[in-house]
Amino acid sequence: MSGEGKRLMVMAGGTGGHVFPGLAVAHHLMAQGWQVRWLGTADRMEADLVPKHGIEIDFIRISGLRGKGIRAQLSAPIRIFQAVRQARAIMRRYQPDVVLGMGGYVSGPGGLAAWLCGIPVVLHEQNGIAGLTNRWLSHIAKKVLQAFPGAFPKADVVGNPVRTDVLALPAPETRLADRSGPVRVLVVGGSQGARVLNQTLPGVAAQLSDRITIWHQVGKGALLTVQQAYQDAGQTQHKITEFIDDMAAAYAWADVVVCRSGALTVSEIAAAGLPALFVPFQHKDRQQYWNALPLEKAGAAKIIEQPQFSVAAVSEVLSGWDRTTLLKMAQKARAVAIPDATERVAAEVSAAAGSRATHVAHG
């Protein structure tokens, strides 16, 4: 389907969980002939990342309102009004056929500005519980989409757009068929690392000894400390790295993953077809718990909340999973995945753009 001459503005910023799914949809539509611009903030990751993907970006000034002091709270209406004005000027200049909100602070003023300009707004909620901005914008959006059931009562469940190299991994029954020896445990802390993983897993390695082999991604600045912890535990045979550049290769290597349960991580693990032990980040909305719950309910994962995440608890879970169990869990994870999430979101964007009056001309 050709999108020749159609214009999309993607609103997403702050974290990879918002930006990467937006980029996946943007590239998919650009391949169909769409023009794409981005709306973001100049001091967050999208400012560097989006232009590297060949997409022009416009900036507005906005930041989060949660947990700020009284002066910031009092000035919030003025700052939001100014951000909406900035976004509206950008919308009028670019004249998109449709706007896609993928989350982050920028989506609020951007979505309101689009609505004021009569431009259809499509929202995508990546997490199992809706963020404040998306909850608010859902009342004015043309279409609301969600990655996991439950964020919105009536929204279509379309999954999270996931990287193509992860989607291309062989099915679990092919990948895991002839494996033997120690169970391969991939520990992923993300770019900043996860202290609870870095502190607990060396002890788990000592407890389970030669029954497991670990590849532990520790995050920025934690390499020497965690290497020392494994050494002190008499476990020098494991692979400890600060970052993992090729996550698809790491997933292909692993029999099981131990990690946080950010929205994209959960979606990637399901797409890869991997069993998981999740330790959700302790957030007051319990966002990561709700992200992980569908996989636990499907029998593909186990959740251990951070206060209970101990050497004994983790060792007990991992030692209870033999290769037969892990293969069944991997197949259940793959069954929960929505591999065509990018295409589903792109189709809804196209439909919303098509619903706009065809006589609207670009300036």
UniProtKB/Swiss-Prot annotation:
Keywords: Cell cycle, Cell division, Cell inner membrane, Cell membrane, Cell shape, Cell wall biogenesis/degradation, Glycosyltransferase, Membrane, Peptidoglycan synthesis, Transferase. The keyword Transcription regulation does not apply. Coiled coil: none annotated. It catalyses: di-trans,octa-cis-undecaprenyl diphospho-N-acetyl-alpha-D-muramoyl-L-alanyl-D-glutamyl-meso-2,6-diaminopimeloyl-D-alanyl-D-alanine + UDP-N-acetyl-alpha-D-glucosamine = di-trans,octa-cis-undecaprenyl diphospho-[N-acetyl-alpha-D-glucosaminyl-(1->4)]-N-acetyl-alpha-D-muramoyl-L-alanyl-D-glutamyl-meso-2,6-diaminopimeloyl-D-alanyl-D-alanine + UDP + H(+). Belongs to the glycosyltransferase 28 family. MurG subfamily. PANTHER family: GLYCOSYLTRANSFERASE (PTHR21015:SF22), UDP-N-ACETYLGLUCOSAMINE--N-ACETYLMURAMYL-(PENTAPEPTIDE) PYROPHOSPHORYL-UNDECAPRENOL N-ACETYLGLUCOSAMINE TRANSFERASE 1 (PTHR21015). This is UDP-N-acetylglucosamine--N-acetylmuramyl-(pentapeptide) pyrophosphoryl-undecaprenol N-acetylglucosamine transferase. It comes from Pectobacterium atrosepticum (strain SCRI 1043 / ATCC BAA-672) (Erwinia carotovora subsp. atroseptica). The lineage of its organism: Bacteria, Pseudomonadati, Pseudomonadota, Gammaproteobacteria, Enterobacterales. The gene is murG.
